[in-house]
Swiss-Prot record:
This is Peptidyl-prolyl cis-trans isomerase D. Keywords: Acetylation, Apoptosis, Chaperone, Cytoplasm, Isomerase, Nucleus, Phosphoprotein, Protein transport, Repeat, Rotamase, TPR repeat, Transport. It is found in: Cytoplasm; Nucleus, Nucleolus; Nucleus, Nucleoplasm. Its EC number is 5.2.1.8. The modification Phosphoserine is found at residues 5, 198. Belongs to the cyclophilin-type PPIase family. PPIase D subfamily. Residues 185-215 are annotated as: Chaperone activity. Less sensitive to inhibition by cyclosporin A than is CYP-18. It comes from Mus musculus (Mouse). The gene is Ppid. One of its GO terms (cellular component) is cytosol.
């Protein structure tokens, strides 16, 4: 008979803990820390632990190192799970256990009754190898068929980020890889806090912070702190790091909005809007014109009459040489703030660009029919 998955994290302080450092598209996203249920499924837990450390050498079946390092998450299905562990073929057809190609289903003690559970992928009964999946929702149809052998105790936000990557079918469009992995011993740093020298003392994902997400005052304090760090990076023209900090603010704000009353959400809106606009400004500096436009559209969803969003969106259109679109946005901005000199100057500049473009076209046609 299957049991409900453990509520405590960890469920047993003596169980081993392992970690994955995850990269998406060559960029570090964060760390997932997992507890392995060695007290319930010792053989399955030991297989996974050893594959995290790489201590067992080379596989007898694959001829490849028995190690998850460099192994991709090859299959992602939103509102279901993320799957990895094929270290040999990297596409779901390979891998092997530390005991040989396959080993038996140890037991089905725990149910797949929530997100963040670690379970063995298989090709039928008693075909466990190295492939695994992490649930992102309850998956009761897998009970009695797949062995639940661990849980995410930190880094659920990283798993959710993986869940939401763009896919072609079930294959991630960007390479999602376990860049580093290993075992965490008693007293080891779990690596949840940033080490970028910025003074940021907050976990990258709010799920890992020991805070009450319903405490709006606390969320605002953290958000202001992170925004200020982002502003420091902006001033030093480190656009990518600035974007990371502004995006982190939005994660904290969105997580809080999901659990608070509607009346309190408006208190978080100004800082969220400011950070979305700042992300747009960074993207303009990076010549990521479409990205800047997308950020400004997000800001305009929050505040349809925001002139800063319209102005920056117009700059994005100019980067794409879509001057008529830029003109339309600047005219809207001028209607809202008729006395704004920056908008007036930008409007004049765009009109001159449109005229120059038309003059150039006329000259081309004149040559053609001369």
């Amino acid at each position: 008979m299957s049991h409900a998955s453990p509520a405590a994290k960890p469920s047993n302080s003596k169980n081993p803990r392992v970690f994955f450092d995850v990269d998406i598209g060559g960029e570090r996203v964060g760390r997932i820390v997992l507890e392995l249920f060695a007290d319930i499924v010792p053989k399955t837990a030991e297989n996974f632990r050893a594959l995290c450390t790489g201590e067992k050498g080379t596989g007898s079946t694959t001829g490849k190192p028995l190690h998850f390092k460099g192994c991709p998450f090859h299959r992602i299905i939103k509102k279901f799970m993320i799957q990895g562990g094929d270290f040999s073929n990297q596409n779901g057809t390979g891998g092997e256990s530390i005991y040989g190609e396959k080993f038996e289903d140890e037991n089905f003690h725990y149910k797949h009754d929530r997100e963040g559970l670690l379970s063995m992928a298989n090709a039928g009964p008693n075909t466990n190898g190295s492939q695994f999946f992490i649930t992102t929702v309850p998956t009761p149809h897998l009970d009695g068929k797949h062995v639940v052998f661990g849980q995410v105790i930190k880094g659920l936000g990283v798993a959710r980020t993986l869940e939401n990557v763009e896919v072609n079918g079930e294959k991630p469009a960007k390479l999602c890889v376990i860049a580093e992995c290993g075992e965490l011993k008693e007293g080891d740093d779990w690596g949840i806090f940033p080490k970028d020298g910025s003074g940021d003392s907050h976990p990258d994902f709010p799920e890992d912070a020991d805070i009450d997400l319903k405490d709006v005052d606390k969320i605002l304090l953290i958000s202001e702190d992170l925004k200020n760090i982002g502003n420091t990076f902006f001033k030093s023209q480190n656009w990518e790091m600035a974007i990371k900090k502004y995006a982190k603010v939005l994660r904290y704000v969105d997580s809080s909005k999901a659990v608070i009353e509607k009346a309190d959400r408006s208190r978080l809106q100004p800082i969220a809007l400011s950070c979305v606009l700042n992300i747009g400004a960074c993207k303009l500096k990076m010549s990521n014109w479409q990205g800047a436009i997308d950020s400004c559209l997000e800001a305009l969803e929050m505040d349809p009459s925001n002139t800063k969003a319209l102005y920056r969106k117009a700059q994005g259109w100019q980067g794409l040489k879509e001057y008529d679109q830029a003109l339309a946005d600047l005219k809207k901005a001028q209607e809202i703030a008729p006395g704004d000199k920056a908008i007036q100057a930008e409007l004049l500049k765009v009109k001159q660009m449109i005229k120059a473009q038309k003059d150039k076209e006329k000259a081309v046609y004149a040559k053609m029919f001369a």
